[in-house]
From Swiss-Prot:
Role according to the record: Facilitates the functional incorporation of the urease nickel metallocenter. Binds a maximum of 4 Ni(2+) and 2 Zn(2+) ions per homodimer. The affinity for Zn(2+) is 10-fold higher than that for Ni(2+). This process requires GTP hydrolysis.
Keywords from the UniProt entry: Chaperone, Cytoplasm, Disulfide bond, GTP-binding, Nickel insertion, Nucleotide-binding
Name of the gene this protein is made from: ureG
GO molecular function terms attached to this record: GTP binding; GTPase activity; magnesium ion binding; nickel cation binding; protein homodimerization activity; zinc ion binding
Keyword Zinc-finger: no
GO cellular component: cytoplasm
Protein name (record): Urease accessory protein UreG
GO biological process terms, semicolon-separated: urea catabolic process
InterPro entries to which the protein is assigned, alphabetical: CobW/HypB/UreG_nucleotide-bd, P-loop_NTPase, UreG
Amino acid sequence: MKTIHLGIGGPVGSGKTTLVKTLSEALKEEYSIAVITNDIYTREDANFLINENILEKDRIIGVETGGCPHTAIREDASMNFEAIEELKNRFDDLEIILLESGGDNLSATFSPELVDAFIYVIDVSEGGDIPRKGGPGVTRSDFLMVNKTELAPYVGVDLDTMKNDTIKARNGRPFTFANIKTKKGLDEIIAWIKSDLLLEGKTNESASESK
């Protein structure tokens, strides 16, 4: 089986690492999983996941990009390719690698050579107009997670308006409104991973059409 490389991107503080943690906890009993995190000067996110005992330590690699976060996932992804190769050497049965980018702006996207698909994470506290502002992460990511919906009343965001704007921005692409700390929205993301990436429940003919 081909190892699925799933990117997770979004601005600083939007909930990327929490999503990685929650997905790993939910999927690790069913699939062989590993994680790569990207930080500019530290391995803070990797250390957090290790300390939380989400996965075995050897299944988590922290990459220090030393520069613009989006460069390491697009223009020069060599460090991440090396990390992928290292994980596959350690575990020859890997089914899913979650690859978290460093925090970046709305223009960041993953190289299609690096990942098979990517989830983009924004949060309500950044403003209800984020979907209208667009950007490649919002409009072209394979799945969009609008996180921290519980904060809407405190930051003056009308969720109904934000959802309508998201529908327009996504143009049919999948998304969910979530509070990932409480696992709200998690089921939709997992269902998408299983159906669209792992192609579970699809016939050979329909799976071929999806590739």
